[in-house]
UniProtKB/Swiss-Prot annotation:
Homodimer. This is ATP-dependent dethiobiotin synthetase BioD. The gene is bioD. GO terms for molecular function: ATP binding; dethiobiotin synthase activity; magnesium ion binding. Signal peptide: none annotated. It comes from Chlamydia felis (strain Fe/C-56) (Chlamydophila felis). The lineage of its organism: Bacteria, Pseudomonadati, Chlamydiota, Chlamydiia, Chlamydiales. GO terms for biological process: biotin biosynthetic process.
Length: 208
């Protein structure tokens, strides 16, 4: 099982979701591109929160910019052919950088590069002004690429807006995130327990 975690934008909760799913499935983790925060990378955070084995990033860029910009500043050209799925028999959680259609290189988008892999996708949407539009546009872009969308995780939406989004997009609900002042290993474990039944039901439907 390979699951790619995509977002409608940057800073929507992808790393938090990755840690939860790594805990839930005892999965390994991989982030193909890390831009900035190399001393406190998303791989480091996921490892601390879940204990997951984390595969080294293909590209480690020093500036917290979009991948193509960070690569330009570092003078490290990104080539799509350099990305390859880590070899593992364990479930694998893959976290993209930024939003679904964020640049991967000077001439490619992450959504196009990573959609070539035989993976399932989870979309993370966080409530902010304009997020409903961004969510609907992202779902449309994912469907245009015929991706296997497992479902959506909703971050800090009011219940009525959750219902509206799920009804309008037709994307299955996989869990919600509340505002957390501090995210700890215990927080992640609690969410994994909360989501367990929803994910088991989703897996059962996929197998039926």
């Amino acid at each position: 099982m390979h699951i790619i975690i995509a977002g409608i934008d940057t800073e929507v909760g992808k790393t938090f979701v990755s840690a939860i799913l790594a805990t839930l499935f005892q999965a390994e983790y991989w982030k193909p591109i890390q831009s900035g925060s190399l001393d406190r990378s998303d791989s480091t955070i996921v490892r601390e929160l879940s204990g997951a084995v984390c595969h080294r990033e293909t590209y480690r860029l020093t500036h917290p910019l979009a991948a193509h910009q960070a690569a330009r500043v570092d003078n490290i050209p990104i080539h799509a052919e350099n990305f390859s799925l880590p070899v593992t028999e364990a479930p694998l959680i893959i976290e993209t950088s930024g939003g679904f259609l964020s640049p991967c290189s000077q001439d490619s988008l992450q959504g196009d590069v990573f959609s070539k892999w035989p993976c399932q996708w989870v979309l993370v949407s966080k409530a902010y002004l304009g997020s409903i539009n961004h969510t609907c546009l992202t779902v449309e872009a994912m469907r245009t690429r015929n991706l296997n969308i497992l479902g959506m995780v909703l971050n800090q939406y009011p219940k009525e807006e959750e219902d509206w989004l799920l009804n309008m997009t037709g994307i299955p609900y996989l869990g919600r995130l509340n505002y957390e002042n501090i995210i700890s290993k215990e927080t992640v474990k609690n969410y994994a327990n909360l989501w367990k039944e929803t994910w088991e039901d989703r897996e059962a439907k996929l197998c039926s």
